[in-house]
Amino acid sequence: MSKMMRRGIFMFVLLFAVSLGIIYYTIDLEALKTITTFNVESLLLAIIALALGMYFDGLRLQRLVKIGGYHLSIKAVLRVIFSNYFMAMLTPGASGGAVAQVLVLRSYDVPISKGTPIVLIRTVFSIMFLVIMLPIVFLYDSIEIPYISRDMLLLFSFLAVMATLLGTYLLQTVYMRKFVYNLAQHFKAHKTKDWLAKLETLNQGLALLYKKPTQSFIVFIESGLSLLCLYCIAPALMFAFTNDVPIITILDRMILLNLILYFAPTPGGTGIAEGLFILLFAPFVPSGTVGIIAVAWRVMAEYVPFFIGMYAVLTLYGRQFVAQETSN
C-alpha cells in the first residue's frame, strides 16, 4: 500500500473517530429531543455562507493574480482554492496547501516565481485580518482566559496589531535580512539560504501590493468578507436548534478560534478545532447539542471542500502528484 493510501486511510479513520467521540461525550437525552426540532433552513443558510465565502475568496485570488500581471478563469480559481483544502488536510502543519496552490497556478501559466508570493500574500492577508480584528473581539466579548485579565488581553491584542503593521515595513529592510540570517545561523546553519529565500519571496509579494495600493486594499477587504462569510456557517447551523443566536458574539469567537487554528500542529487542526469549538460555543446552544454542531461545522467548512479539492487535484495531476507531495 502506498504512503498516499495509508495517509488517506489514517485521515479518514482519525476524522471519523474524532467526530464520533465528540458526539458521544457531548450528547444527552435532552439533546435527542432537541434534534427533532432541526430545520432544513439552517442547513441552507450554511450552504449559502459557504458559497459566499468561496466567492469572495475567488475574487481576491483573481485580483491578486491580476496584480501580478496574469489572468485566471473561474475554473482555475476554483481549482486553486479547493486544492488548498485538500492538500492542507493531508500534510502536517497544512504545508501541502501552499504547494498545491502554486503548482495549480503553474498549470494555468502563472510561473512559480509569481505564484509563490501570490499564495503567500493570500495567507498573510487572512492572518492579518484576524489579528487586526482581535482588539474588537476582546472589547466586545468578555472571553475569560485563566490567569490573564481582560485588560491584559486587550493590551496583547493591540500590541499584536502594532507588531503586524510594523512588521510589514521592517520585512523590507536590511535589518530584517540580518536578523533572519543570524537566526538561521543560530538554529539551522545549513538552511540559511532557505530562510533568506522565504523572506525574499514574502518581500516580492509585498512589492506587488505596494505597486497597486488601491487594489491591494480591496484584496484585504475581500479577504475579510470571505472569512466572515465562512464563519457564518457556525451560527447558521446553530439556528437548527435555537433561535436565540448572538451572531456578533459567535463571529468574534470564530475569529479567535480560527486564528489559533492557523498554528495548530495537527493536519487540518483535527481534534483541536472541535475541542475549541465546544469550549467557546457550548453556552450558546441547548445542552448536549454543541458536539453535533461542532462536527457539522467541520463537515461543512472543511470536509466538503476537502473532497471537492481531492477531485480537482486528482483530475488535474493524478495520483502521482498527491503521492509525491504527501511523501515529502
Could you say what each language-model-derived stretch is?
Residues 85, 89-95, 123-135:
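Mid-bilayer segments of alpha-helical transmembrane spans in multi-pass integral membrane proteins
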Residues 1-82, 148-261, 300-328:
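Predominantly cytoplasmic-facing regulatory/coupling regions of multi-pass membrane proteins
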Residues 199-202, 265-269, 275-298:
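Hydrophobic alpha-helical transmembrane segments in multi-pass integral membrane proteins
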Residues 133-144, 310-311:
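Transmembrane alpha-helix termini and helix-breaking/packing motifs in multi-pass membrane transporters
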Residues 75-76, 93, 98, 108-124, ...:
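Membrane-interface alpha-helices at helix entry/exit sites of multi-pass transporters
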Residues 66-67, 89, 107, 139, ...:
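Transmembrane helix-loop junction
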Residues 78, 82-109, 196-203:
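Extended non-transmembrane interhelical loops and adjacent amphipathic helices
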Residues 55-58, 91-102, 260-277:
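Transmembrane helix boundary and interhelical junction motifs in multipass membrane proteins
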